[in-house]
Design a protein with these regions (language model features):
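Short Gly/Thr/Asp-enriched flexible loops that form oxyanion-binding sites at enzyme active sites
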Residues: 123
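Conserved phosphate-donor
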Residues: 98-100, 104-120, 186-189, 193-200
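Conserved short S/T/G-enriched processing/targeting/catalytic segments and their helical context
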Residues: 1-102, 126-172, 186-187, 206, ...
Length: 254
């Protein structure tokens, strides 16, 4: 059980997940649950987070790391080429052990020249789809039925002008979406949230990193403050109606 959230921001990319892994012989028979790492940074440049078989995620992360070291992305000069290279790395590795389709999907963030990109590698067939500034969020995993409507509401309320969020806004929304899903899911998705960001550093180089516990706590506090502010709207709804303005009598002409 997993929830993944990815956002394209005006100045970066955010990917987050829950922290829960379930044990058991199959999806219908679970034994125990524990906290694990689900969001990974490869070579300080790529962010990966997967849903599905844990072993497939381990293999995919290792294969991407090896490909980067071997300059396997050197010919990927446009985002679609980089995304196809990621897909091919995974598909070829999975095929080597005859893994069936539908066992693993992922979100990936990566730089291509002066662009920062978010790609969804579909659970059904691992085919890549780039997210854009018009379609700037994605979610995957068993928590998707909760996160998609929530993210859609965030887009409608905060970004009705069509612009994507800033990185700071994206970290806030990702944290809120993960906390919301962790709170409401029927089982198998638990905290704490794990979040990584890809952005250009002060030198102008792309840099991917996991946010620190202190940074996560700051965003969680912002979410709690927003929820408290929303809750206070009840006072407005339940307030007595304002008294009507007194009518000023009209004096007859003299």
């Amino acid at each position: 059980m997993t929830v993944l959230v990815g956002l394209v921001c005006s100045d970066g990319i955010v990917i987050g997940s829950d922290s829960s892994a379930t044990f058991g012989p199959d999806i219908a028979h679970k034994t125990i649950e524990q906290s694990v790492q689900k969001v990974f940074v490869v070579q300080g440049r790529i962010i990966l987070a997967g849903t599905g078989q844990v072993g497939a995620g381990q293999r995919f992360t290792a294969a991407v790391d090896a490909a980067w070291t071997a300059k396997g992305f050197s010919k990927s000069h446009i985002p679609t080429d980089f995304a196809k290279t990621l897909a091919n790395i995974g598909i070829e590795d999975f095929a080597s052990t005859k893994m069936n389709h539908g066992c693993f999907g992922a979100l990936a963030a990566f730089p291509v020249k002066d662009k920062l990109c978010l790609c969804e590698l579909a659970l059904a067939d691992f085919q890549p789809e780039l997210k854009t500034k018009d379609m700037w969020f994605a979610s995957m995993g068993s928590g998707q039925p909760i996160t998609d409507p929530f993210l859609g509401m965030m887009r409608r309320i905060f970004f009705s002008d069509g612009r994507p969020p800033t990185l700071k806004e994206g970290l806030f929304i990702t944290t809120w979406a993960l906390m919301h899903t962790i709170e409401l899911n029927p089982g198998g998705i638990n905290g704490p949230p794990q979040i990584a960001k890809l952005a250009f550093n002060a030198k102008g180089d792309p840099e991917a990193r996991l946010i620190s516990d202190d940074e996560l706590e700051e965003h969680k506090n912002s979410v709690q403050a927003a929820e408290k502010h929303l809750c206070q709207y009840r006072e407005i709804l339940n307030a007595p109606p304002a008294p009507a303005d007194p009518k000023i009598p009209v004096m007859p002409p003299q």
